[in-house]
Amino acid sequence: RLAHIFISHLHGDHCFGLPGLISTLGMLGRTGGLVVHGPKEVETYLRPVMDLFCRGMEFEVRFNPVDTRSHSLVMEDRSLSVYSIPLKHRIPTCGYLFAEKPKEAHIIREMTDFYQVPVRCMKDIKQGQDYVTPEGEVVPNSRLTRPAAPPKRYAFCSDTAYNRSIIPIIEGADLLYHEATFAECDLARAKETFHSTARQAAEIARDAHVKRLVIGHYSARYEDLSELHREAEAVFPGTILG
């Protein structure tokens, strides 16, 4: 079922596993195509590796270069749109915003049976139209349908320095994953390496009014993550450790 892979940037911890995954999919007999989205350098890195280790596969791997400097549509299908989020890191990097498309209303079968609604009218009713009976009675759409669940939005932001310019893009997201590589005591190191602290991640979440925050991408120097969790929780209660 995997059809799309989204790569943020060309640092090893974000892309070294890709050749092995593609090779494994080939060995498992995959035949459907696969699209890899990411900075244009991703194809430069992956093509020679695939030529060596992924020959003879029964499926095509396509590359979709993403402009890491702009907020733009990356891909969409019937149910989902994916947008790039320009991030601030040492090399070209982008996050991704995954936005569900609104779903059609749910038919209340008991009511459509009661009013003997023809099958040919169901599509229009799902899209919000009222139903007019052969006798001319107007049946409100609200009597025939239940609203679908609101569409959800998920933002993935890693790796990045503290970058308030992403706030309008992720405003109100249902879930934000934001890197939190360092604690505040290592703020200077965070600035030097273009990473964020846990507190900074929480400030972004708070000011963007997201519903939930997951932090991750911790430096290996922290054996105990409780300090990072406390710093984020102080700004954004309910922060989840990823």
What residues fall within each predicted segment?
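A glycine-rich helix N-cap at a beta->alpha junction
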Residues: F53-V66, G238
